[in-house]
A protein has these predicted regions:
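Non-heme di-metal
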Residues: 2-347
Length: 347
């Protein structure tokens, strides 16, 4: 098990030559020098993430307060359980990202991880705002803690949670790779049954404020996915032994498990009882996402026949675009919130 070194905090003897900088095990000074970055992609990522700033309470949820009691039993059950799951995921992220950052020795990447951590806190704020608006305090607490009272949801969370705990308890190059892959799976696969549910509500004219909150969260998660994909690709160049045949097999199994868990979760929480969605649509879309994420790491497709976005699900990406020039009917403000062009990437 190869060692990974925790970066020092005060290090006057650190290496200031940017050409020597590495993702892990570099002798860093921790100085944030925006004019000298080892990884050129960081500048674009940083600017995009900064320009994506938003405030949850600026989105009007009055219509949602009226709509929520009118949802069908299946829709309300799915809304509650998906929101509980999202609360858990983003809370876990804001707690875990600093653990990863302690071992990342490229200071410009640490800047990105700090922004991501902040954005995960904004997402938690958003979910709290949604819950405070639509339900009473007792209902709120019940929804908030379904991530551990619902046995299916608890099992769902154990895979990523255990991988995160492993890195906290035993730091090595291998466990660092696994925790980064776990982040990649969480950001790129785990959210999407939930996202598609909210967007389906949106295209049926329900819960417009919740849909808009999710669109901004989705946009942030896309940048987080892009960040971890690039971190992994840099690791692949700098630590090629982490991407040998045995490690690729492990990565493959992790992604497959993430895909299968997301499909099972989507079919449990959405099923065939919600107008506009069914279990087959969930499975088709998540397998497509699994291929898309896996290919972005320079690997082949995992699932034959799922290479392209399913025709039945093309509306998901349309609803996910928070930068469409459009005025929200409930608040008369442009959803082109970002001040710069969104990062174009095949993720």
């Amino acid at each position: 098990m190869e060692e990974i070194k925790r970066k020092p905090l005060f290090n006057p003897k650190g290496d200031i030559d940017v050409r020597n900088r590495r993702m892990i095990n570099f002798n860093t000074t921790n100085i944030n020098d925006f004019n000298n970055m080892r990884y050129e992609w960081v500048s674009d990522w940083y600017r995009q993430a900064m320009n994506n700033f938003w405030v949850p309470e600026e989105i009007n949820l009055n219509q949602d307060k009226s709509d929520y009691p009118k949802l069908s039993e299946a829709e309300r059950r799915a809304y509650d359980k998906i929101l509980s799951f999202l609360v858990y995921l983003d809370s876990l992220q804001s707690a875990n990202l600093p653990n990863i950052s302690q071992y990342v020795t490229a200071n410009e990447v640490n800047l990105c991880l700090s922004i991501q951590t902040f954005q995960e806190c904004i997402h938690s704020q958003s979910y709290s705002y949604m819950l405070d608006t639509i339900c009473n305090p007792t209902e709120r607490n019940d929804i908030l803690y379904q991530w551990k009272t619902d046995e299916h949801l608890l099992r769902r969370n154990e895979f990523i949670g255990n991988l995160y705990n492993e890195f906290v308890e035993r730091q090595s190059k291998d466990s660092f790779l696994r925790v980064c892959i776990a982040n990649f799976i969480l950001e790129g696969i785990y959210f999407y049954s939930g996202f598609m549910f909210f967007y389906n509500l949106g295209r049926n004219g329900k819960m417009p404020g919740s849909v808009q909150e999710i669109r901004y969260i989705n946009r942030d998660e896309n940048t987080h996915l892009w960040l971890f994909r690039n971190m992994l690709l840099e690791l692949k160049k700098e630590e090629p032994e982490l991407f040998d045949e045995a490690h690729i097999a492990e990565i493959t199994e992790m992604v497959k498990k993430g895909v299968e868990q997301e499909i099972a979760w989507g079919q449990y929480v959405i099923g065939d009882s919600i107008p506009g969605l069914n279990g087959k649509m969930v499975e088709d879309y998540i397998r497509y996402l699994g291929n898309l994420r896996y290919r972005s790491l320079g690997l082949p497709n995992l699932y034959e026949g799922y290479e392209k976005e399913p025709e039945s699900m093309k509306w998901v990406s349309q609803y996910a675009d928070a930068n469409m020039v459009k005025t929200d009917f409930f608040e008369a403000r442009s959803t082109a919130y970002a001040k710069s062009t969104a990062i174009e990437d095949d993720l």
